[in-house]
Amino acid sequence: IIIKESSREMMPSHIGLSNFSIFFILPFYSKKASSPTKMGEIMNLGVPIICNSGVGDVDEVMKKSMPELLVKEFNNKEYESVIDIMLNDFKPNRKIIRQTSNNYYSLNNGVRKYLDIYNQILN
């Protein structure tokens, strides 16, 4: 495992070199309706993510692209299970990861969805 400080400008390059990205967000009530921006950015680079469930749409997005890497509980059994998958079985499908990112986080899709909502309200 290599942990390295990086400037904002170098983040895409460094993330793109990664085999995995990992982040955990405590699933507080305020996080139920949020979505981690970094998740879309990382997935758009085709990098598999290890993260926890219970935050915004994370569960749904992970189940579509890399369900094996979703940590459902903060305990050693879950961590060990994901580590075992990482080290032995997991072959990331970077194309699926990128497609899922595009489906959920694309600016064009977001603009279109908001436009549809506003049109429904106004009509």
Residue ranges and their predicted role:
Residues I2, P27-K31, P67, R98-N102:
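Conserved short-loop catalytic and cofactor-binding motifs
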Residues I3-S6, K72:
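Short loop/edge segments at beta-strand edges and connector loops
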Residues G16-N19, I83-K91:
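Short, surface-exposed amphipathic charged segments that create phosphate/polyanion-binding patches used
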